[in-house]
Amino acid sequence: MGSNLPAQPNLRVTIIAADGLYKRDVFRLPDPFAVATVGGEQTHTTSVIKKTLNPYWNEMFDLRVNEDSILAIQIFDQKKFKKKDQGFLGVINVRIGDVIDLQMGGDEMLTRDLKKSNDNLVVHGKLIINLSTNLSTPNPNQANGLHRTQLGASTSSGLVPQVAPTPSVPQAGPSSVDQSAAASSASLNPQRVPSATRPTSQIAPPNGAPPIANGQGVPRPNLSSFEDNQGRLPAGWERREDNLGRTYYVDHNTRTTTWNRPSANYNEQTQRTQREANMQLERRAHQNRMLPEDRTGASSPNLSETQPQAQTPPAGGSGASNSNVVSMMATGATTAGTGELPPGWEQRTTPEGRPYFVDHNTRTTTWVDPRRQQYIRMYGQNASGGNTTIQQQPVSQLGPLPSGWEMRLTNTARVYFVDHNTKTTTWDDPRLPSSLDQGVPQYKRDFRRKLIYFRSQPALRIMSGQCHVKVRRNNIFEDSYAEIMRQSASDLKKRLMIKFDGEDGLDYGGLSREFFFLLSHEMFNPFYCLFEYSAHDNYTLQINPHSGVNPEHLNYFKFIGRVVGLAIFHRRFLDSFFIGAFYKMMLRKKVSLQDMEGVDEDLHRNLTWTLENDIEGIIDLTFTVDDEKFGERRTIELKPGGEDIPVTNENKHEYVELVTEWKIVKRVEEQFNAFMSGFNELIPADLVNVFDERELELLIGGIADIDVDDWKKHTDYRGYQEQDEVIQNFWKIVRTWDAEQKSRLLQFTTGTSRIPVNGFKDLQGSDGPRRFTIEKSGDPIALPKSHTCFNRLDLPPYKSHEVLEHKLSIAVEETLGFGQE
C-alpha cells in the first residue's frame, strides 16, 4: 500500500480534542496524548495534556494517503505508557475514502466514539478530528514552536485553551472557567459535515470550543447545566444526566425532578403555584414528624388495622369489647375505677370541694384516682404468637412518679404527665416499662432511654424568660441570622417566641415549627454555596468545600450550627437531612470507608477494590490527591513527603484511611468547626454523644409518617415478582411496623429517612432518579443487604413470614452505623 502513496503530503489531519475519557486509575486523572498512524509507516504524536478526561490539543499533521489508507488514532495515558497496556484509553480507525474525496478535495469534521483494542479494556468517550485536503496554509505545529508549550501550560490548570475570536464572531456564552470540567461534547455534535460549501479558513468559536468552519455545521456553544439547546431553563431549574445518558431536570424551587423539560410558558405564576403546593405538602409532612418519646403505643398509627392479632381481652373481666379497647388504646383514654383504694392511699377534698388522693407510701398527692384503669401495650410474645399485648391496669400500679413529675387528666379523661424540671408535658408515662420490656428491639429501648436521659439534663432545661425573634417571611435567612447571632447562648435557651412581621399570631408552638420549617428550606439551599447536594442523591446535604466563595461563610456556618442546636433544644425539627458521615462527624466519630458511599460512589468502589486486590504493578500511586478549586488543580500531600511515598500492598490501608478522611473531613474542616462551635453553645458535646448517627438524624429531622401504599406502588423487583410469597410477606411486615421502624428501614435501604415531597416516585439515587428496588439475592441463612446509592435491598428467598421478619428486623434494627454494602 505504501507504493501507492503520493510523494508529498496530501491530507492535513487535525486532532482537536477528546471528550469523556475513561478514568482507569483509581485516584488520579490521566495525562492523555494521541498517536496518529497511517499504514504503520507514518506516525505523529500530540503533546501531553496533564490530568484531564477532556484533553484539547488542536494539533495538525500532514500525511501522505490514498483512499484505501486507514488512519488510526490511539489515545494513551503518558504516566502509564511504559506499563503493559501502555495506558490505552481508546482508538478510532478511519478509512480515508469513506469520509473525504481526495480528488475533489474537501474539509470534514468527524466525531467518533473511541473503540476497544484487542485487550478488550474498557474505554469511553469520543475523539474529534478534522480532515482537510487544503495544505496551502502553514502548519502551525511546525511554524510556531511555542504552540505546544503554551497549550500544555494552559490546559494543565484545568482550563480549556481559548483561541482569539475573529471580530465577526461575537464573544458570547459562558466563560471557559465555567466550562473547565469538559470540552463539552455538545459542541461537537455533527459526525460528518458536508464539505461542498465549507471554506478552508476556520473561525474559532467562543468558549474555546474546537474550531468548526463557517457553513452548514453551526456549532452549539458549550452549554451550562442551566441551559440546553432550546435555550435558558427557567429560574431554579437544572439539567442533568443519569448513568444511562438520559437527560432529566431538577427543579430546585420545589426540590423535585422530571424527565420533561420545563415548557417555555412555564411562567413565574406557574412556578409560584407549584412551589406553594409542594411547600404545603412538605409543611404537612414536617408537622407530622415526631420522636418515640412523643408517643406511647397508644398513639401508634392505625393500631386497629395493623395489629388485630396482637390484642387480648383486658384483664379483670371488664366487659369492654375488643373494639372499645382498641379505641381507648388509640386515644389514650382511661376508665373510672371501682372498689377500695390501693393499700396506703387516702381520698381527701380541698376547701373548694375538689377530691384529691394521698399516697402515704410515697408521701405524695395527685388529682388522679389511683383506681382509674388504663390500657397499655406490652411487648413480647403472647399466646397467639404476636409481638404485643394490650393489658389493663390501674394507673397507680407502676409506683411513684420520678421527682418533679405530676400526673394530670385531660377533659377526655386521658392521662398526661407534667415534668416540672423541664417545664414540659408528655403523653408518655415516665414509669411505664412497656416500651422498655425485654421483648423490645435493643435500638428502641436504647433510643427512648437516651431521649429521656437527654431531655432530663439540666443543660437542656428552658431558662426563665422569653427569647423574642422577629422575622419577615420573604427575608427569613438574613433576618434570622441577625436576630439569632445578636443574642447570647443563654438568651436562646429561654422560651422561644417567634413573630412573623405583619402577622398577629401568638407563638404557642405552631409559629416556631413554621419558623424552623421555612428557615431550614432557605439556609440549606445549595444556591447559597454553603451546602451542596451529595453525590448520593438530590436531597441529602453535605458541606460545600468551596463555600469560601462567600467571605462570610464561617459566620454563616456558626449561625447554622446555632439553629440546629436551637431546634433540638426547643424540641423542634428541621426539614433537612445530611449524609450519614455528617452525623458521625457531629458525634466526633471516626469516618470509615463505608461513609464514602454517600459522598463519592466511584471513589468508594475504587478504594474498596484497592483493599481487596493485589495492587503491585497495577496501580501507580503516591500519598497524594488531586483537588480542583474554581478550575485550578492542586496536588495535596496526605502526609508529609507523601508525593515521594508510593502506595503498596503494605501501606494501602493507611492510604485508604487518609483519602477517606481528606475527602469527608479535611476538605471542610474549617466550615465544620464553625458549625460545631455554634451547635455546642446550646447542646453540650457530652450530651449529644449518647446517640449514634442514625438516632441523631431522627433527633434533628424527626420521624416521618410513611405511606406504605405509595412505597409499594413505586417499587421495582429483580428476580422476584410482586405476587411472590416473599414480597407479599415483606409488605405485610412493613405495614405492621410503627413509624420509627419504617424510618429505620428507609434509612437502611436509602441512607436517609427523608421522603421526597412528591412521594417515592421521586426517589433519587447516586446517578439520577432511582426507584426503590428489591432484588432476589443472598443465602436464606444470611441477613438482607442494602445498597444505599441505588436504593436497593438484596432480599434472600426466606421460606416463611417469621424468618423474614426476624432477619429483616436484625438487619434494620441492630445494625449500627452506615456499614451496609
From Swiss-Prot:
<keyword id="KW-0963">Cytoplasm</keyword>
<dbReference type="GO" id="GO:0005934">
    <property type="term" value="C:cellular bud tip"/>
</dbReference>
<dbReference type="GO" id="GO:0010795">
    <property type="term" value="P:regulation of ubiquinone biosynthetic process"/>
</dbReference>
<dbReference type="GO" id="GO:0010793">
    <property type="term" value="P:regulation of mRNA export from nucleus"/>
</dbReference>
<feature type="domain" description="WW 1">
    <location>
        <begin position="231"/>
        <end position="264"/>
    </location>
</feature>
<dbReference type="GO" id="GO:2000238">
    <property type="term" value="P:regulation of tRNA export from nucleus"/>
</dbReference>
<dbReference type="GO" id="GO:0019220">
    <property type="term" value="P:regulation of phosphate metabolic process"/>
</dbReference>
<feature type="compositionally biased region" description="Polar residues">
    <location>
        <begin position="133"/>
        <end position="144"/>
    </location>
</feature>
<dbReference type="InterPro" id="IPR035983">
    <property type="entry name" value="Hect_E3_ubiquitin_ligase"/>
</dbReference>
<dbReference type="GO" id="GO:0022626">
    <property type="term" value="C:cytosolic ribosome"/>
</dbReference>
<feature type="compositionally biased region" description="Low complexity">
    <location>
        <begin position="202"/>
        <end position="217"/>
    </location>
</feature>
<dbReference type="GO" id="GO:0034605">
    <property type="term" value="P:cellular response to heat"/>
</dbReference>
<dbReference type="GO" id="GO:0032880">
    <property type="term" value="P:regulation of protein localization"/>
</dbReference>
<dbReference type="GO" id="GO:0072671">
    <property type="term" value="P:mitochondria-associated ubiquitin-dependent protein catabolic process"/>
</dbReference>
<dbReference type="InterPro" id="IPR050409">
    <property type="entry name" value="E3_ubiq-protein_ligase"/>
</dbReference>
<feature type="compositionally biased region" description="Polar residues">
    <location>
        <begin position="297"/>
        <end position="312"/>
    </location>
</feature>
<dbReference type="GO" id="GO:0005737">
    <property type="term" value="C:cytoplasm"/>
</dbReference>
<feature type="domain" description="WW 2">
    <location>
        <begin position="339"/>
        <end position="372"/>
    </location>
</feature>
<dbReference type="GO" id="GO:0045723">
    <property type="term" value="P:positive regulation of fatty acid biosynthetic process"/>
</dbReference>
<dbReference type="GO" id="GO:0032443">
    <property type="term" value="P:regulation of ergosterol biosynthetic process"/>
</dbReference>
<dbReference type="GO" id="GO:0032956">
    <property type="term" value="P:regulation of actin cytoskeleton organization"/>
</dbReference>
<dbReference type="GO" id="GO:0004842">
    <property type="term" value="F:ubiquitin-protein transferase activity"/>
</dbReference>
<dbReference type="InterPro" id="IPR024928">
    <property type="entry name" value="E3_ub_ligase_SMURF1"/>
</dbReference>
<dbReference type="GO" id="GO:0010994">
    <property type="term" value="P:free ubiquitin chain polymerization"/>
</dbReference>
<feature type="domain" description="WW 3">
    <location>
        <begin position="399"/>
        <end position="432"/>
    </location>
</feature>
<dbReference type="InterPro" id="IPR036020">
    <property type="entry name" value="WW_dom_sf"/>
</dbReference>
<dbReference type="GO" id="GO:0016567">
    <property type="term" value="P:protein ubiquitination"/>
</dbReference>
<keyword id="KW-0808">Transferase</keyword>
<dbReference type="GO" id="GO:0061630">
    <property type="term" value="F:ubiquitin protein ligase activity"/>
</dbReference>
<dbReference type="GO" id="GO:0006515">
    <property type="term" value="P:protein quality control for misfolded or incompletely synthesized proteins"/>
</dbReference>
<dbReference type="GO" id="GO:0005634">
    <property type="term" value="C:nucleus"/>
</dbReference>
<dbReference type="InterPro" id="IPR035892">
    <property type="entry name" value="C2_domain_sf"/>
</dbReference>
<dbReference type="GO" id="GO:2000203">
    <property type="term" value="P:regulation of ribosomal large subunit export from nucleus"/>
</dbReference>
<feature type="domain" description="C2">
    <location>
        <begin position="1"/>
        <end position="112"/>
    </location>
</feature>
<comment type="similarity">
    <text>Belongs to the RSP5/NEDD4 family.</text>
</comment>
<dbReference type="GO" id="GO:0043130">
    <property type="term" value="F:ubiquitin binding"/>
</dbReference>
<dbReference type="GO" id="GO:2000235">
    <property type="term" value="P:regulation of tRNA processing"/>
</dbReference>
<dbReference type="GO" id="GO:1903577">
    <property type="term" value="P:cellular response to L-arginine"/>
</dbReference>
<dbReference type="GO" id="GO:0000151">
    <property type="term" value="C:ubiquitin ligase complex"/>
</dbReference>
<dbReference type="Pfam" id="PF00632">
    <property type="entry name" value="HECT"/>
</dbReference>
<comment type="function">
    <text>E3 ubiquitin-protein ligase which accepts ubiquitin from an E2 ubiquitin-conjugating enzyme in the form of a thioester and then directly transfers the ubiquitin to targeted substrates. Probably involved in the regulatory network controlling carbon source utilization. Ubiquitinates 'Lys-528' of the uric acid/xanthine transporter uapA at the cell membrane, leading to its internalization, sorting into the endosomal pathway to the vacuolar lumen where it is eventually degraded.</text>
</comment>
<dbReference type="GO" id="GO:0043328">
    <property type="term" value="P:protein transport to vacuole involved in ubiquitin-dependent protein catabolic process via the multivesicular body sorting pathway"/>
</dbReference>
